[in-house]
From Swiss-Prot:
Protein name: Cbb3-type cytochrome c oxidase subunit CcoP
Membrane topology, as annotated: Single-pass membrane protein
Organism: Azospirillum sp. (strain B510)
Gene3D superfamilies on file: 6.10.280.130, Cytochrome c-like domain
Keyword NADP in record: no
């Protein structure tokens, strides 16, 4: 058993333990610390009486006040929903164009649309609608299926080549794999991709460009338009073929990527959000996307 020892310099007893010749003084706690400790104990006892504290199986002590953070949260959520109800009802009853003409509804729809976009759309289209490889930019004026409020609303609602009965485009279809399916030879693909490069002011072989135009007219113009203006501008419905004279490419506008695209084809799909989101939410999204900067 350790033996207490009184320190000669301070006159204070030690704890009786020694480590490498070092002894710990057995000083009492400061009075202020001790009193504060007692106050904390007293406060804890008062808290136990007034507030929820002890778990009891599947329940718990409720306290005299019967306070519940969960009930407070539910109350505040219900209050918030009640405040939003009139706006959501109005949005559900109006068209997207009508919503944009109503200053109050527009502000509410933009705020909600931003939140819905970040939660449901940003993973593919980017937080600011800047797009990514294979996912269209929503902040420019190049639209594959139309950039009006009504067009955007319909696209979000029914999707692109989705399993929705009113989807835009035909499910299971897309751009033909001209090389993989044996429709064009490697030389023809080389020529037509040089032709597309020339349309964008990029270096291309003049001899290939002339032959590539013929290949384009015979195989590509039906969807992309006679002047590569895209299906929308060419009035070709239900295709969604992009313009081929632009700066923002869906998959890339360099030679290698163009060859890959023509050889293997492309087939983008977007889900029909009407199966996951209510109509007011979809309209708010349409308003938000339309106002990202490229809406028609």
């Amino acid at each position: 058993m350790a033996q207490n020892y009184k320190d000669e310099l301070s006159g204070v007893e030690t704890t009786g333990h020694e480590w490498d010749g070092l002894r710990e003084l057995n000083n009492p706690l400061p009075k202020w610390w001790l009193y504060l400790f007692y106050v904390c104990i007293a406060w804890a006892m008062v808290y136990y009486v007034f507030y929820p504290a002890w778990p009891l199986g599947k329940t718990y002590t409720k306290g005299i006040l019967g306070y519940s953070q969960r009930e407070e949260l539910d109350s505040k959520l219900a209050e918030a929903k009640a405040g939003q109800a009139k706006y959501l009802t109005a949005i559900a009853a109006k068209s997207v164009d009508e919503i944009q003409k109503d200053k109050d509804l527009l502000g509410f729809a933009m705020a909600g649309g931003r939140s819905y976009f970040n939660e449901n759309c940003a993973a593919c289209h980017g937080a600011g609608g800047q797009g990514a490889k294979g996912f269209p930019t929503l902040a420019d004026d190049v639209w594959l299926w139309g950039g009006t409020s009504a067009d955007i609303y319909k696209t979000i609602q029914h999707g692109i080549r989705s399993d929705d009965g009113d989807t835009r485009g035909t499910p299971g279809t897309g751009m033909t794999a001209f090389g993989k399916d044996g429709i064009l030879t490697r030389d023809q693909i080389d020529q037509v991709t040089d032709y597309v490069l020339s349309l964008n002011g990029k270096a291309a072989d003049a001899g290939k460009v002339a032959k590539g135009k013929t290949v384009y007219d015979e195989n590509c113009a039906a969807c992309h338009g006679d002047t590569a203006q895209g299906a929308l501008a060419a009035g070709v419905d239900g295709v969604g073929a992009p313009p081929l004279k632009q700066a923002n490419w869906l998959y890339g506008g360099d030679k290698a990527t163009l060859v890959e695209t023509v050889t293997n084809g492309r087939a983008g799909v977007m889900p029909a959000w009407s199966k996951r989101l209510d109509d007011a939410t979809i309209k708010s999204l349409a308003v938000y996307v339309h106002n990202l900067g490229g809406g028609k």
